[in-house]
Amino acid sequence: MSDAFDINDLKRRMEGAVNALKHDLGGLRTGRASASLLEPITIEAYGSTMPINQVANISVPESRMLSVSVWDKSMVGAVERAIRDSGLGLNPITDGMTLRIRLPELNEQRRKELVKIAHQYAEQGRIAARHVRRDGMDQLKKLEKDSVISQDESRVLSEKVQKLTDDTIAEMDKIVAVKEGEIMQV
């Protein structure tokens, strides 16, 4: 095969799309507590905006509770406000330098909304994978047109790119199915 085409670059980009999907799904609230639920929250601290995990330690002491241990006493109020204003519907209770957050039960309607959002994230991931495939196919066509690779090499590499795309999309579908199961579990 030709050195002019690097399928590993496409693999890295597709893995990036899968990781982005995992990150997006991590922010969706399921019936269980998860430290990743608070990852998107940012805090105004020390004259800049920073992620919550840079000013506090997040743990899961119980299946329906999060514990946020703030490292600097002066930041407790800012962390509490940020969690309250995050739009996640969470209400932290302050206990010294620790915030305790009990996660309320999700009702059926909210579960269905979260599943829809998960499917939207999955579609965005599939679109990203298809864009990577399109870039790879365009690159192959150009290499073939410029006589850098033969038609046979182009066909074989095209099949590899398609298989990589199919495998990536199948992996994304599995990830979303697991997340959907977590969301719908009562």
Swiss-Prot record:
One of its GO terms (cellular component) is cytosol. The keyword Phosphoprotein does not apply. Keywords: Cytoplasm, Protein biosynthesis. Pfam families: RRF (PF01765). InterPro entries: Ribosome_recyc_fac (IPR002661), Ribosome_recyc_fac_dom (IPR023584), RRF_sf (IPR036191). Its main location: cytoplasm. GO terms for biological process: cytoplasmic translational termination. One of its GO terms (molecular function) is ribosomal large subunit binding. It is found in: Cytoplasm. It comes from the Bacteria. CDD domains: RRF (cd00520). Belongs to the RRF family. HAMAP family: RRF. Responsible for the release of ribosomes from messenger RNA at the termination of protein biosynthesis. May increase the efficiency of translation by recycling ribosomes from one round of translation to another. PANTHER family: MITOCHONDRIAL RIBOSOME RECYCLING FACTOR PSEUDO 1, RIBOSOME RECYCLING FACTOR. This is Ribosome-recycling factor. It comes from Brucella melitensis biotype 2 (strain ATCC 23457).
